[in-house]
From Swiss-Prot:
Function: Catalyzes the non-heme iron(II)-dependent oxidative cleavage of 2,3-dihydroxyphenylpropionic acid and 2,3-dihydroxicinnamic acid into 2-hydroxy-6-ketononadienedioate and 2-hydroxy-6-ketononatrienedioate, respectively.
Protein name per its UniProtKB record: 2,3-dihydroxyphenylpropionate/2,3-dihydroxicinnamic acid 1,2-dioxygenase
Pathway participation: Aromatic compound metabolism; 3-phenylpropanoate degradation
Gene Ontology terms describing biological process: 3-phenylpropionate catabolic process
GO MF term list: 3-carboxyethylcatechol 2,3-dioxygenase activity; ferrous iron binding
Cofactor(s) this protein cannot do without: Fe(2+)
Subunit record text: Homotetramer.
Catalytic activity: 3-(2,3-dihydroxyphenyl)propanoate + O2 = (2Z,4E)-2-hydroxy-6-oxonona-2,4-dienedioate + H(+); (2E)-3-(2,3-dihydroxyphenyl)prop-2-enoate + O2 = (2Z,4E,7E)-2-hydroxy-6-oxonona-2,4,7-trienedioate + H(+)
Length: 312
């Protein structure tokens, strides 16, 4: 039994609003190394903690976290279409284990997932189906949010389960770091926007293209005086990475949602996926971790980081 972890940022603007060629080459190189490590590990199972961006989950029923026994990519921002290769019975066993651990996780037998889940699978495996994968989607953009201590406990429950399998398991967390793309809030939203946030599934191609164009436009001015969005916060990002690398996970229980939103951006809460992933790894004991990469990239509206870890 071997368990390894990779946490990395994702960005729908990759290839659509790129920084300089030298930065793109840096990211390409670190992703190539990460892919090679995944290839060498050859996981028998991947568990991916990921966010959603109002593509599969909406306010008509917004769970704090949900596990899927079947999932299909919405193929936004040019990501791969098609189903994920989910081992249904194993996903159900994991669901029962999480519920028995005192955590009320939601269950979906037909979930739509977006780039927040699929981009990382594509970058690290080249496919949505190469390895068996169980996706766990954590609400990271639609307040109110579950407290961070619940996310840590979710990760711990998942970690206890995967440790019992006797398999090579890769745990992925994807999102963040400091991050504020133009995601609307329900509070105070105009009627049309509110309706989308409540029940906006399966938009027309024209509506999806318009939404993506707004994100690209935001990326072109992000980090300048023209942008109304919270700027990237390198100090916050690096402090968070240090906390994870050093194994200080108990401190996460004291994270305050409003403070993070103000300091690092409203979508920084995608770090919940990193919290769950590291808590899952730590459930089996001490780990060793390393920071593979970090750079604030305004064009991608992301403090872009990559971190790897494994059990000692």
């Amino acid at each position: 039994m071997t368990i390894k972890l990779k946490c990395l940022s994702h960005t729908p603007l990759r290839g659509l609003n790129d920084p300089g060629a030298d930065v793109v080459a840096e990211v390409d190189a670190v992703l190539a190394r990460s892919r090679a490590e995944v290839e060498a590990f050859d996981p028998e199972l991947i568990v991916i903690f990921a966010p959603d961006h109002y593509n599969g989950l909406f306010y008509d029923l917004m769970p704090p976290f949900v596990i899927a026994t079947a999932a299909e990519s919405v193929a936004d921002y040019g990501t791969l279409p098609g189903p994920l290769s989910i081992p249904r019975d194993l996903a159900l066993d994991l669901t029962r284990h999480i519920l028995d651990s005192g955590l009320d996780i939601a269950l979906s037998h037909r979930l739509q997932v977006d780039h927040g889940c699929t981009q990382t699978l594509e970058e690290l495996t080249g496919s949505l189906t190469r390895y068996p994968v169980i996706p766990i989607i954590i609400n990271s953009v639609a307040p109110p949010f579950a407290p961070y201590r619940r996310i840590r406990k979710l990760g711990e429950a998942v970690g206890r389960f995967v440790a019992s399998l006797g398999k090579r398991v890769l745990i992925l967390g994807t999102g963040g770091l400091s991050h504020e793309p133009p995601v609307p809030l329900l509070s105070g939203a105009a009627e049309e926007i509110a309706e989308f946030l409540i029940a906006g599934r399966n938009p027309t191609p024209e509506a999806r293209a318009a939404r993506q164009a707004r994100t690209i436009a935001a990326g072109k001015i992000y980090g300048t005086a023209e942008s109304p969005l919270t700027p990237l916060n390198t100090d916050w990002d690096l402090a968070f990475i240090d906390l994870l690398v050093q194994g200080r996970l108990a401190e996460i229980d004291d994270f305050v949602v409003e403070e993070i939103s103000t300091t690092a951006g409203r979508s920084t809460h995608e770090i919940r996926t990193w919290v769950a992933a590291f808590a899952a790894l730590a459930a089996g004991g001490a780990y060793r971790a390393r920071q593979d990469y970090y750079r604030p990239i305004n064009e991608w509206i992301a403090g872009y980081g990559v971190v790897s870890a494994e059990r000692r």
